[in-house]
C-alpha cells in the first residue's frame, strides 16, 4: 500500500462524491466520467472505486451514522463537508485496515484542500467524537459476527 496513492484516491473520491451529490446522476456514470475526464494519475484506483461505490451504496446508513455527532443539522452541511464526512464514516465503519487516526488526519487535510475556511475544524470535531465509538462497534461486530446487533 502506497500512502500517497491512497491520499490521491481519497481526493478523487471527494471530487467524485461531490459531482454525484450535485448532479444526482447514477454513481456508475459519475465513476466512468470521472475516470475518463479527471487527473487520477498516482491514485490507487482500486481503493477509489471501492470507497466511491461503497459510500454510494450505503449513503443513507452513513448519513445516519454521522448525524449524532454533528453540531448542526445535516441539511446545513455543505456538499464538500458531506462528501468528506461520508468518506470518513465509510472508512471508520468498513475499513478496519485503516487506522482511525489516519482517517481523521486525511479528512482534515481534505477539508483544508476542498472545504470552506473552517471546514477542517468542523470535520475534526465530528470525527474526534465519532471515531472511538464507531471503531468500538466495529470490534464488537467482528467478534460477534455480522448478524449480531451492536446497538
Curated annotation (Swiss-Prot):
Pfam families noted in UniProt: NusB (PF01029)
Superkingdom in the source lineage: Bacteria
Gene Ontology CC: one annotated term: cytosol
Any GO molecular function: RNA binding
Biological process annotations from GO: DNA-templated transcription termination; transcription antitermination
CDD domains from the UniProt entry: Terminator_NusB
InterPro entries according to UniProt: NusB-like_sf, NusB_fam, NusB_RsmB_TIM44
Alphabetic keyword roster: RNA-binding, Transcription, Transcription antitermination, Transcription regulation
PANTHER family in UniProt: ANTITERMINATION NUSB DOMAIN-CONTAINING PROTEIN, N UTILIZATION SUBSTANCE PROTEIN B-RELATED
Protein task: Involved in transcription antitermination. Required for transcription of ribosomal RNA (rRNA) genes. Binds specifically to the boxA antiterminator sequence of the ribosomal RNA (rrn) operons.
Assigned protein family: Belongs to the NusB family.
Protein name as catalogued: Transcription antitermination protein NusB
